Amino acid sequence: EPLRFTQLARPLDFAAVTDHAELFGEVEICTNPDAPGFLSPECVLYRSFPEQSFLIFNLAAVGLPELPQFPVPEGVPVVSDLPVIGSDGRIPRLPYCGLNGERCLEAAKTPWRDTQRAAEAFYDRSDACRFTTFVGYEWTGAPLSNNLHRNVIFASEVVPEIPPAYQETPAPELLWDALDERCREADGCAWLSIPHTS
């Protein structure tokens, strides 16, 4: 039984679903049997042991070294070359992502398009405009497991082809620079970055 109950006087008339961009492509590959990398040890782990893989995938996305120290269930392949933070400060993607993470970056376009389609499907563009949906995502900054997440919300349906993720932009300033580069007001794109759980 809750101690108190709070309810807004009127419901919100806007929403944005902000999924974590860091694993858009990785999860797409692991769940698509036609994708190169579907049979990789990491994807087998992802599908076979979802709870353990959640931890390992998320730690890999923030670039912590020595990830094999975490317990892995018996019979699961141990990945010895999980990403570590590079000398340039960037975080390489999982091995099945290919050279420079290109496979995962390409695969990330599918869930990102799904996000855009969902926002458009529920946007009331009638004169009544009863509900507004925004395209958005979460940039999951977590240096050394510190929580520096940002919700990135776009003002219109004009958005970058791929949202900048923490692996490519491992600092808020790098995120903002990448957003400025990929989301130009002259092209009808505008963004807002909102820190949360910082």
Report each predicted region and the residues it spans.
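Extended, charged catalytic domains and RNA/DNA-binding interfaces, predominantly
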Residues: 1-198
